[in-house]
Curated annotation (Swiss-Prot):
Family per record: Belongs to the dicarboxylate/amino acid:cation symporter (DAACS) (TC 2.A.23) family.
Protein name per the record: C4-dicarboxylate transport protein 1
Gene3D superfamilies in alphabetical order: Sodium:dicarboxylate symporter (1.10.3860.10)
Organism: Mesorhizobium japonicum (strain LMG 29417 / CECT 9101 / MAFF 303099)
Cellular component terms (Gene Ontology): plasma membrane
Membrane topology: Multi-pass membrane protein
Annotated function: Responsible for the transport of dicarboxylates such as succinate, fumarate, and malate from the periplasm across the membrane. This transport system plays an important role in the energy supply of rhizobium-legume symbionts.
């Protein structure tokens, strides 16, 4: 007769508060603000810390995307799923990117953050924005699409272009699936290679507090908190609009699809704080992909949706573009008719696609939009150049949440979301720290729920018990 486990089973050791990654990043951000404010020269000199961390993360992004996408697609029994997932993802991206643009227009017209400033265009330093405007003129729809195709396979990985790596990874995954039995050894090798690569991601994430500290100290030291005061209405309106979009629009989408936006944000809090510190949603891409897979979304869906979303689903950038354009028009007393605003919306829908998830890309995209919309003066961008960095954090945070929601929603539409695993992950039954270095491969639907670690109210399993009870880790504990 089997006897139940006694409540006296040894409890798993709990982390102290400061040992939690998100607490370390939060403390680092606060220290960075303090150093940048009180010692601005030192703060500016700490910029290499943030730059070095972002470069370290970019170093691993291409291998993570390649391994995740190629193994996910190669493991599909039906290759038509690739087209379905991509199609559903694009429908989602276009729908909610357009909604973000519309929300920015509506809030901008209601609050009118630039009204009453009466800025004279001749008094603005247009030289400050010439560099961004020249970059904007280099962008075109045809050029963007052609740039998705790498010149060489090696070149895509060397340059670290997300869309080029994704393009090759999809083709390679399809080819690997088509060769059948003879490709299984290659697939097995790539699956084995995933373990050390994600372990490396965990190691790199341990440096996140240092990177966040350096980046925040530089931002405050160079631009100063006081620079926000003059344009506080614009910054405040943008943050309010992003808040309404995340908790209103995306919150409703989450509820309709069976989960809570609050639970999702709590689940990805480490990634959000990392983005807050670095102002770049790209810094959290590897760990976000790992988190979404742990939450029950199939690897093939996560690998397609999130990297693609970093170019096609930038909700924060979309809100920023329409709101900033309206602010410039209002501040310079430029009247925008309904037709002008519709043109602004249509142009922004195109120019926002392909905006990279790196710091400052939103400003270049705004320049590209205004250069096509003659009613809004491009020179007016000089007004917001000083506070753009402070809005960059909010753009990146909104982009990150939007892509996290997209991956779960598209996975659910495709029937590739394990609801039991999602609930368990949101409740903390699976390791949430990306620094653990032990990513889960999405389990098969037949046994995914059964393999979850169970935790009763009166006791918890030891780490060894968990390792013995779960076969889904890529590397043993």
């Amino acid at each position: 007769m089997l006897t139940p486990l006694a409540p006296s089973v040894k409890r798993a050791p709990r982390k102290t508060l400061f040992a939690k990654p998100y607490v370390q990043v939060l403390v680092a951000i606060l220290l960075g603000v303090a150093v940048g404010h009180f010692y601005p020269q030192i703060g500016e000199n700490l910029k290499p810390l943030g730059d070095a961390f972002i470069k370290l993360v970019k170093m691993i992004i291409a291998p993570v995307i390649f391994l995740t996408v190629s193994t996910g697609i190669a493991g599909m029994s039906d290759l038509q799923k690739v087209g379905r997932v991509a199609g559903k993802a694009m429908v989602y991206f276009v729908t909610f990117s357009t909604l973000a643009l519309i929300v920015g227009l509506i809030v901008g017209n209601v609050i009118q953050p630039g009204a009453g400033l009466n800025i004279d265009l001749t008094s603005l330093d247009v030289q400050a924005v010439n560099g961004y405007a020249s970059k904007a003129h280099e962008q075109s729809v045809t050029g963007f699409l052609m740039n998705m195709i790498p010149t060489t396979i090696v070149g895509a990985f060397v340059e670290g272009d997300i869309l080029q790596v994704l393009f090759f990874s999809v083709l390679f995954g399809i080819a690997l699936a088509m060769v059948g039995e003879s490709g299984k050894s290659v697939l097995s090798f790539l699956q084995d290679l995933t373990a050390p690569v994600f372990k490396l991601v965990g190691i790199l994430m341990k440096a996140a507090p240092i990177g966040a500290f350096g980046a925040m100290a530089f931002t405050i030291g160079k631009y100063g908190i006081g620079s926000v005061a003059n344009l506080a209405m614009l910054v405040g309106t943008f943050y309010l609009t992003a808040f309404l979009f995340v908790f209103g629009v995306l919150g409703a989408v989450c509820r309709y699809n069976g989960f809570s936006i609050f639970s999702l944000i709590r689940y990805i809090k480490e990634e959000l704080l990392l983005v807050l510190g670095t102002s770049s949603s790209e810094a959290a891409l590897p760990s976000l992909m790992e988190k979404m897979e742990k939450a029950g979304a199939k690897r093939s869906v996560v690998g397609l949706v999130i990297p693609t979303g970093y170019s096609f689903n930038l909700d924060g950038t979309n809100i920023y573009m329409t709101l900033a354009a309206l602010f410039i028009a209002q501040a310079t007393n430029t009247d925008l008719s309904v037709g002008d605003q519709v043109l602004l919306l249509l142009v922004a829908m195109l120019s926002s696609k392909g905006a990279a998830g790196v710091t400052g890309a939103g400003f270049v995209t705004l320049a590209a939009t205004l250069s096509v919309v003659p009613a809004v003066p491009v020179a007016g961008m000089a007004l917001i150049l000083g506070v753009d960095r402070f809005m960059s954090e909010c753009r990146a945070l909104t982009n990150l949440v939007g892509n996290a929601v997209a991956s779960l929603v598209v996975a659910r539409w495709e029937g590739e979301l394990d609801q039991a695993q999602l609930k368990a992950a949101f409740c903390g039954h699976q390791p949430a720290e990306t620094s653990a270095g032990q990513p889960l491969i999405t389990p098969a639907p037949s046994n995914s729920a059964a393999s979850l670690p169970v935790e009763s109210p009166g006791w918890s399993q030891t780490p060894d018990d968990r390792a013995a009870g779960s076969k889904q880790t890529l590397a043993g504990r």
